């Protein structure tokens, strides 16, 4: 089991939560990005730098993740591919993607993309709140506990 992070857009506060979890549980965390990242020295935390380009980091995460792995991403198409491979996906706001929710999220994403393409200003997401951080930590902990139970 491993944790993969779509790190280019992942908030630093979420990365910090993941770093602490990696040390505590000794589950490897890999941050995938197209830019250099600073991470604390650890046997359980590494970075993987990919080339610049559309979906290059996403494609690398899909290529390397395995069934049972967790991917941290706000990218809905990436989350859908991870679920199709048997992995789990969690966004930085603490929402765990599922087969039931991913279709709805993809439809909404496509709709918003159509609006933006037609010139409608849709705005971006709100900034990450304390509640979002707590929700993320709680969902991460649920996944970590499930992994621990599986490993005996």
Swiss-Prot record:
NCBIfam families in the record: PRK00124.1
InterPro entries (UniProt xref): UPF0178 (IPR003791)
Protein name: UPF0178 protein KPK_4355
CDD domains in the cross-refs: PIN_YqxD-like
Family: Belongs to the UPF0178 family.
Pfam families: DUF188
């Amino acid at each position: 089991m491993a944790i993969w992070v779509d790190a280019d857009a992942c908030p630093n506060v979420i990365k910090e939560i993941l770093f602490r979890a990696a040390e505590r549980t000794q589950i490897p965390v890999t941050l995938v990005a197209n830019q250099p990242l600073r991470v604390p020295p650890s046997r359980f935390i590494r970075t993987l730098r990919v080339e610049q380009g559309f979906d290059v980091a996403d494609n690398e995460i899909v290529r390397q993740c395995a069934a049972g792995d967790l991917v941290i991403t706000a990218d809905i198409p990436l989350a859908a591919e991870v679920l199709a491979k048997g992995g789990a996906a969690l966004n930085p706001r603490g929402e765990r993607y599922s087969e039931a929710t991913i279709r709805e999220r993809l439809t909404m994403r496509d709709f918003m993309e159509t609006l933006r393409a037609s010139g409608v200003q849709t705005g971006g997401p709100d900034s990450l709140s304390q509640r979002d951080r707590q929700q993320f930590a709680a969902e991460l902990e649920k996944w970590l506990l499930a992994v621990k139970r599986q490993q005996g």
